[in-house]
């Protein structure tokens, strides 16, 4: 790894720890709050310095668009597939999901991937191919593979995979009583409001990490 200043190392460690704990990097605002910076712009300057030293990659326009890079240029948390040295856990990749059938039904499985389970904040049960850019600012882009742990409940603020009627969506979860709000991480998308007494809603799982396939 390149030689980092004390502050740069602290920020790098925070990014690493946040990904390990939540599966996703912190925002600039969260970094600024952690270190007492006056604004997210100060955090941005440190992130750019880390990017120039080659230890992280930044995705323009995404508040959580930060990727750690390991020595040799590989990213340990959002990485290219396949990686022959990391074949320890086999996960099904879920493609399109038919209405009314379980998300892990055989007809939904496009293929199997073998990955290193240590790359995720919790052990995932399946991968879901992301479609669209509604979670862009969380660093989740169209075509990414979201690692998902099956769960029937979620804490507020978690990124979840949910089924609403015939659709499966990835959003940030917020619940108050019998009302659920599914919030995009992109200002171009409005929140989805769910009435649990009226709407057909099912939580399929929690996001625990992300894989970005290599460009063809």
Swiss-Prot record:
Catalysed reaction, written as an equation: Hydrolysis of Ala-|-Gly bond in repressor LexA
Active site residues according to the UniProt entry: 134, 171
Subunit structure of this chain's protein: Homodimer.
Annotated Pfam families: LexA_DNA_bind, Peptidase_S24
Keyword Cell cycle part of the UniProt annotation: no
HAMAP family tied to this protein: LexA
Organism in which the protein naturally occurs: Ralstonia nicotianae (strain ATCC BAA-1114 / GMI1000) (Ralstonia solanacearum)
Enzyme Commission identifier(s): 3.4.21.88
Family as reported in the entry's similarity comment: Belongs to the peptidase S24 family.
Role this protein plays: Represses a number of genes involved in the response to DNA damage (SOS response), including recA and lexA. In the presence of single-stranded DNA, RecA interacts with LexA causing an autocatalytic cleavage which disrupts the DNA-binding part of LexA, leading to derepression of the SOS regulon and eventually DNA repair.
DNA-binding residues: 28-48
Biological process, per Gene Ontology: DNA repair; DNA replication; negative regulation of DNA-templated transcription; proteolysis; SOS response
Gene name as annotated: lexA
Residues at the site labelled Cleavage: 99-100
GO MF annotation, one: serine-type endopeptidase activity
InterPro entries named among the record's database cross-references: LexA, LexA-like, LexA/Signal_pep-like_sf, LexA_DNA-bd_dom, LexA_repressor, Peptidase_S24_LexA, Peptidase_S24_S26A/B/C, WH-like_DNA-bd_sf
Keywords tagged on the record: Autocatalytic cleavage, DNA damage, DNA repair, DNA replication, DNA-binding, Hydrolase, Repressor, SOS response, Transcription, Transcription regulation
Record's protein name: LexA repressor
């Amino acid at each position: 790894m390149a030689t980092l200043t004390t502050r740069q190392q602290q920020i790098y460690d925070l990014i690493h720890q946040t990904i390990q704990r939540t599966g996703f990097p912190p925002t600039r605002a969260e970094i600024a709050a952690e270190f007492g910076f006056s604004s997210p712009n100060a955090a941005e300057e440190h992130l750019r310095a880390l990017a120039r030293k080659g230890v992280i990659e930044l995705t323009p326009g995404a508040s959580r668009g930060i990727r750690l890079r390991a020595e040799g240029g590989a990213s340990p948390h959002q990485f290219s597939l396949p990686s022959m040295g990391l074949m320890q856990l086999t996960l099904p990749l879920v493609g399109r999901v038919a209405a009314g059938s379980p998300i892990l039904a055989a007809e939904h499985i496009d293929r199997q991937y073998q990955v290193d389970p240590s790359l995720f904040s919790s052990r995932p049960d399946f991968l879901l191919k992301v479609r669209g850019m509604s979670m862009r600012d969380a660093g989740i882009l169209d075509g990414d593979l979201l690692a998902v742990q099956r769960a029937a409940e979620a804490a507020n603020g978690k990124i979840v995979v949910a089924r609403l009627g015939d659709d499966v969506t990835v959003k940030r979860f917020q619940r108050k009583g019998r009302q659920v709000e599914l919030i995009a991480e992109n200002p171009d998308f409005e929140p989805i409001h769910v009435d649990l007494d009226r709407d057909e809603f099912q939580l399929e799982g929690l996001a625990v990490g992300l894989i970005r396939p290599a460009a063809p």
